Amino acid sequence: DAVITEISDSDGRNELEVPAWDLDGRLKQSNNEWWKSLQDVFETLGVSNKKFNLRVKPNIPAAVGLGGSAAIAVSIIRCVSKHFKLDLTDPEINDLAFVCETAAHGTASGIDNTIATFGEPLVYQREPSTIIETLKFEKPVSLVIGISNTPSLTAEMVAGVRARWKENT
């Protein structure tokens, strides 16, 4: 699995730990926009008053453009849905993860949360109308991913691309 999330009941405050990414803290007291969006998701799901701790174990490095924040959001939402017997569908999980991605990146494309939710190669289009189609291959396809070990935040990259696009249009 790309991300494993464990949930446990708590008698105190809600906490989120992502040790591999050096993230931990109390959900309600965080100033991080992504964590705030998780709290909004929990309110939407009706579990914000429940006491629980989340421990997330990503097998994706942070800030390398591989959709790690989306994978974590999807994993957390699935875990909470299962724990509280909410029976969320993949489209519902995808919509909620998109909320987290928008908070994390400002303007999210939707591709990362969609791939993380459905877990298979897809054709994805957000506008003018959403298209999600599974890609089928007759033979296995090799995929090579290079990681430069130079972290960069997607939100900063998106903002830079948007600024250059506006300058040239």
Predicted feature residues:
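FAD-binding core of FAD-dependent oxidoreductases
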Residues: 1, 63-73, 107-120
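DPxDG-like acidic metal-binding loop motif
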Residues: 66-86
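Short hydrophobic alpha-helices at membrane interfaces in multi-pass membrane enzymes
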Residues: 91-92
